[in-house]
Design a protein with these regions (language model features):
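Conserved class I S-adenosyl-L-methionine
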Residues: 18-27
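Conserved SAM-binding motif I beta-strand of class I
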Residues: 43-48
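Conserved SAM-binding loop of SAM-dependent methyltransferases across substrates and taxa
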Residues: 30-41
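C-terminal substrate-binding/active-site "lid" region of AdoMet-derived donor-dependent transferases
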Residues: 112-171
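Conserved short alpha-helix immediately C-terminal to the canonical SAM/SAH-binding motif I
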Residues: 31, 52-56
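A short SAM/SAH-binding and catalytic strip from SAM-dependent methyltransferases
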Residues: 102-115
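S-adenosyl-L-methionine
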Residues: 1-17, 55-99
Length: 171
């Protein structure tokens, strides 16, 4: 996630400053927690449909918030950045949530169906504002309209193997 964020900041001249991060199909919430440490987003939201993963993410969130609160309280002078904003996890279908305020949408879409990818593109075409960035893994969003550009597709080693990362940006 750090490499992807650095890439986006470099390519788009810090265009995500003070934005909102959404993780579609957030699982147990690792990308949301990672992004909260890497960048000071206004809002970080993970959206997960599966009960077990959603419930597990709530426990991880609580542990993370307790840990970070203690570290900032005890070592405030060691940190040269603001305390991360709180993260939030929503239980439900990410296609039923509002995406109008997103700056970055992340989808580890390796296992998403073609139909799911088309539904994500359809919703992004309808709701995302100019400058919104969508990051997908393994599969790109082929049905985005002409207002979107595919900025890059590059391969990175993940803990589970190699993935192609696609960066889409609304003009």
């Amino acid at each position: 996630m750090a490499y992807i964020l650095e890439y986006i900041n470099h390519e788009f001249n810090g265009a995500i400053r003070d934005g909102n991060f959404y993780d579609l199909g957030s699982g147990i919430g690792k990308p949301v927690i990672a992004m909260s440490l890497l960048h000071h987003f206004k809002k970080l939201i993970g959206i997960e449909y599966l009960d077990n993963l959603f419930n597990y993410s709530l426990g991880i969130k609580q542990n993370y918030e307790n840990y970070i609160e203690e570290r900032f309280r005890k070592n405030k002078d060691l940190f040269n950045f603001q305390k991360p904003n709180s993260t939030d996890f929503l239980h439900g279908n990410f296609l039923e949530q509002n995406w109008e305020d997103t700056s970055i949408i992340f989808a580890n879409s390796t296992c998403f169906s073609e139909n799911m990818m088309n539904n994500i593109a359809k919703k992004a075409n309808k709701e995302c504002k100019s400058g919104t960035i969508i990051i997908t893994f393994t599969k790109r969003l082929t049905t985005l309209n002409a207002e979107w550009e595919l900025r890059d597709g590059f391969r990175r080693i993940m803990t589970w193997g190699v993935a192609t990362i696609y960066i889409h940006r609304r003009k």
